[in-house]
Amino acid sequence: MSHATFANRKSKTIIMKKLSFLLLSFCTILCMYGQKAHELQSPDGNLRIVINLSDKIQYDVMYRNDILLQQCALRLEVGNQQLGSNPKLTKVSRKSINESLTPVIPLKYSIVSNTYNQLLLKFKGDYSIEFRAFNDGVAYRFITDKKGIIDVNSETLQLNFPENYLLHVQQPGGFKTAYEEEYRHIQSNEWKTSDPMILLPVLIDTRKEYKILISESDLTDYPALFFKSNGNNSMSSIFPKVPLEFGEDGDRSLKIEKEASYIARTNGKRSFPWRYFVISTNDEQLIENTMTYQLAQKNVLKDTSWIKPGLASWEWWNGATPYGADVDFVAGCN
């Protein structure tokens, strides 16, 4: 073998090694980008939600340096697609909002301050997840941009507690509920998978200086959210499926005799309900919060002058019982 031939082969070997190294480095960078943590802070800097992307989407909720919820998972199953599994991030956008909202009918306030920071993560597969951080809580929702009508088979919202929390909850016997069950007080690490599910809202006492109120907003063409225990100091979402056939069940309700395999059949271009967490350091903040209103769909009525607040009376509830031969229905409460 000539000296020139040997030198050429050696040069090619070196080039191949360099190319392999560059390719490996490029793949490593891609993996690091795919697993990058995205952080969103509240305007006052106290609240943080840290979103981690790997083979799934998980997030932590923190107040200053205290972890309140950890490695919480989210996913939406649409048809045969798992939105949130092996996510491929395509775009990240941020913005800050500082506005005032004016309710048509004031409940707590005539003017509601709506100040938050927003993070929008767009993924391959025609979906996005929007996060918002307020000074008194955090929220997120799925957004899809799909053609036609879609079937939502399930939505996963898994919450993991870093310590034993005290849960103040209502436990219905099933999805058919009047939301009138008495509140129970459950140790999160003692809540078993065989125990009844719970409905919203859920109030959590971390046993430190924080309380967490969990609920939802902007429910349109979608079922209400319930939770079941995972048995390991965590809980996951559970939803009623779409009813297909009904039967008689008393004078004011229907019995579901057949269910679909999906929880919603809905428009493919839409935003889904907000899942929100009010974080309070004192109980006053729980009463003062307006998160449901702030996250609700904006009013679409052009004329609201006809809407007036007033009193309502339900004779079955207050015992007026204006029935029978002796009732002549004159003005007033008979």
Protein language model regions, located:
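Bacterial Sec-dependent N-terminal signal peptides
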Residues: 1-37
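Generic detection of intrinsically disordered/low-complexity segments and helix-coil linkers/edges
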Residues: 3-5, 20, 27, 53, ...
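Generic detector of bulky aromatic hydrophobic side chains
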Residues: 8, 13, 43, 142, ...
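N-terminal accessory beta-strand-rich subdomains and adjacent acidic, glycine-rich linkers
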Residues: 39-292, 299
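An acidic-aromatic substrate-binding cleft motif
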Residues: 267-333
